[in-house]
Curated annotation (Swiss-Prot):
Protein name, as recorded: Prolycopene isomerase, chloroplastic
The organism of origin for this protein: Solanum lycopersicum
An example Gene Ontology biological process: carotenoid biosynthetic process
Family of this protein: Belongs to the carotenoid/retinoid oxidoreductase family. CrtISO subfamily.
Ubl conjugation among keywords: no
Main location: plastid
Upper classification of the organism: Eukaryota, Viridiplantae, Streptophyta, Embryophyta, Tracheophyta
Function: Carotene cis-trans-isomerase that converts 7,9,9'-tri-cis-neurosporene to 9'-cis-neurosporene and 7,9,9',7'-tetra-cis-lycopene (also known as prolycopene) into all-trans-lycopene. Isomerization requires redox-active components, suggesting that isomerization is achieved by a reversible redox reaction acting at specific double bonds. Isomerizes adjacent cis-double bonds at C7 and C9 pairwise into the trans-configuration, but is incapable of isomerizing single cis-double bonds at C9 and C9'.
A molecular function (GO) term: carotenoid isomerase activity
Length: 615
């Protein structure tokens, strides 16, 4: 739900994002809505069909004047809705003239593709849907522009080495305006514990200590250890950890920082917290902090991952892109096109083509085939090795991965448009709600994450309205085997319960203020995001040894690479963006666009493979 933050070379910083000043209690960015997509579309919007009305849930929604709109279609009329900067009619390519084919246009896939294109590679991205972004995409309905996934955006700062989104955009000559969020998240927890994560670190520590004054020393020591890790990463130029020339170069430049990270690589946040903290309520709070990073508690969350989020929210801060999260993918897609590569939409890859054990191409559902020197899968590892490749030929390395990690649950998502006056003045943008019992933290529907992006950018909704995006963990098994009628009825029942909890805890009168509502289930995520069981990503079966067991980008299949949330370092927009940078660097070295040593490569990959067996 939340995101991790890593680094990209610092030389690309200048001019890549513009910060919009905060207002007072009103929405912090007001902009006249345009009838077309501004400069990110190739061609004139007046000559193109507008992408609007995208819907990835089926629900009975209240009309904006209180009436009822039935059966909002989940299927887009793709002939009318395809973005003009994408293509859908590229012929199959038998020659293998592409340097790389990327399956999927999620953020990880787009970053890998754009980084390769910048290095001079010819890249083709194949996207099943009609817009880019995957979980970081968007859809529009009745004047509302909804983020598909999380609205908590790291990586947009203008300082340090961990502003990966800023620099990924800059690499292809793109920039986005952003709005700083003064509060990362407002926790509403058992025993009336209310904690705001302020942008300023000292303000956050002061508030947390005021709730647990007897744990002041432990609080400072735990978060100081997080900063030790963060500062080590912030000093490094992170690229592919599978590329030895780069890796050894960084070690010789920054040996202390590299050794610090190596020390914490197999450790988890919960075990570190317990060195300094005894209060069970405070430890449970740290569990909640980690849960929004990894969907598991602190004892199962790698310390490096936790440190990135718990510190970068104060260092670089949370910054929301003007126009919504979908602007990130749109900008990267435009940048890819500007650099001579392309995205093919409505391109449903059904299999990876092997030739003597080497990945050489892909086949689409319509029969077209495309060939390239390398194949990069932005699908989950379960989809890649269970569907795009034959599961019975699962490599040993993937067997080991699936023994150590399971598919995390999916989510129930509720997108709503509400009357603005239901929200109190100075309402925070992001909320985490767990009312009564800490043991419900990881249970289905136990905790609720809420984003109200119109608190920051009012242009996302009609005047006088707000957007609420609610999500809570849910397993696909809860939604299988239902008739269409029972499926719709269950969505209404579950959504009603979730909304009632928010009405009781945060916003009295919420139900009566609803003007639009649409519900998505794990089946929705599976269908539109092409994710096995709609999963959020991998989570450890037991207590992991930090990040030691997470696979990198190379695979046991020659010519096949993976990128995204089932690769190191894991889930979250910045994490998958970093995965994309790592993947592009490794692929570029293998294609001859970067320096490479075959002898060192072989030795390092064997070492990394052995280390993963220790997890």
């Amino acid at each position: 739900m939340c995101t991790l933050s890593f680094m990209y070379p610092n030389s690309l910083l200048d001019g890549t994002c513009k910060t919009v000043a905060l207002g007072d209690s009103k929405p912090r960015y007001n902009k006249q809505r345009s009838s077309c997509f501004d400069p990110l579309i190739i061609g004139n919007c007046t000559d193109q069909q507008q992408l609007c009305g995208l819907s990835w849930g089926v629900d009975k929604a209240k009309g904006r004047r209180g009436g009822t709109v039935s059966n909002l279609k989940a299927v887009v009329d793709v002939d009318k809705r395809v973005e003009s900067y994408g293509s859908s009619d590229v012929e199959g390519n038998e020659s293998g003239s592409y340097d790389a084919i990327v399956i999927g246009s999620g953020i990880g896939g787009l970053v890998a593709a754009t980084q390769l294109a910048v290095k001079g590679a010819k890249v083709l991205v194949l996207e099943k849907y009609v817009i880019p972004g995957g979980s970081s995409g968007f859809y529009e309905r009745d004047g509302y522009k909804f983020d598909v996934g999380s609205s908590v955006m790291f990586g947009f700062s203008d300082k340090g080495n961990l502003n990966l989104i800023t620099q990924a955009l800059a690499a292809v000559g793109r920039k986005l305006e952003v709005i700083p969020d003064p509060t990362t998240v407002h926790f509403h927890l058992p025993n009336d514990l209310s904690v705001r994560i302020h942008r300023e670190y000292d303000d956050f520590i002061e508030e947390l200590v005021s709730k647990f004054p007897h744990e002041k020393e432990g609080i400072i020591k735990f978060y100081s250890e997080c900063w030790k890790i963060f500062n080590s990463l912030n000093s490094l130029e992170l690229k592919s950890l599978e590329e030895p020339i780069y890796l050894f170069g960084q070690f010789f430049k920054k040996p202390l920082e590299c050794l610090t990270l190596a020390y914490y690589l197999p450790q988890n946040a919960g075990s570190i917290a317990r060195k300094y903290i005894r209060d069970p309520g405070l430890l449970s709070f740290i569990d909640a902090e980690c849960f929004i990073v990894s969907t598991v508690n602190a004892l199962q969350t790698p310390m490096i991952n936790a440190s990135m989020v718990l510190c970068d929210r104060h260092f670089g801060g949370i910054n929301y892109p003007v126009g919504g999260v979908g602007e990130i993918a749109k900008s990267l897609a435009k940048g890819l096109d500007d650099h001579g590569s392309q995205i093919l939409y409505r391109a449903n890859v059904t299999s990876i083509i092997l030739d003597n054990g080497k990945a050489v191409g892909v086949k689409l559902s319509d029969g077209r085939k495309f060939y390239a020197k390398t194949i990069v899968s932005n699908a989950t590892r379960w989809d890649t090795f269970g569907k795009l490749l034959k599961a019975e030929n699962l490599p040993k390395e993937e067997e080991n991965f699936q023994k150590a990690y399971v598919k995390a649950p999916s989510f129930l998502s509720i997108h709503m448009g509400v009357k603005a006056d239901v929200l109190p003045p100075d309402t925070d943008c992001h909320h985490f709600v767990l009312e009564d019992d800490w043991t419900n933290l990881e249970k289905p529907y136990g905790s609720i994450f809420l984003s109200i992006p119109t608190v920051l950018d009012s242009s996302l909704a009609p005047e006088g309205h707000h957007i609420l995006h609610i999500f809570t963990t849910s397993s696909i098994e809860d939604w299988e085997g239902l008739s269409p009628k029972d499926y719709e009825a269950k969505k209404e029942v579950v959504a009603e319960r979730i909304i009632s909890r928010l009405e009781k805890t945060l916003f009295p009168g919420l139900k009566s203020s609803i003007l639009f509502k649409e519900v998505g289930t794990p089946k929705t995520h599976r269908r539109y995001l092409a994710r096995d069981s709609g999963t959020y990503g991998p989570m450890p079966r037991g207590t992991p040894k930090g990040l030691l067991g997470m696979p990198f980008n190379t695979t046991a299949i020659d010519g096949l690479y993976c990128v995204g949330d089932s690769c190191f370092p894991g889930q979250g927009v910045i994490a998958v963006a970093f995965s994309g940078v790592m993947c592009a660097h490794r692929v570029a070295a293998d294609l001859g666009f970067e320096k490479k040593s075959d002898v060192l490569d072989s030795a390092l990959l064997r070492l990394l493979g052995w280390l993963r067996t220790l997890a």
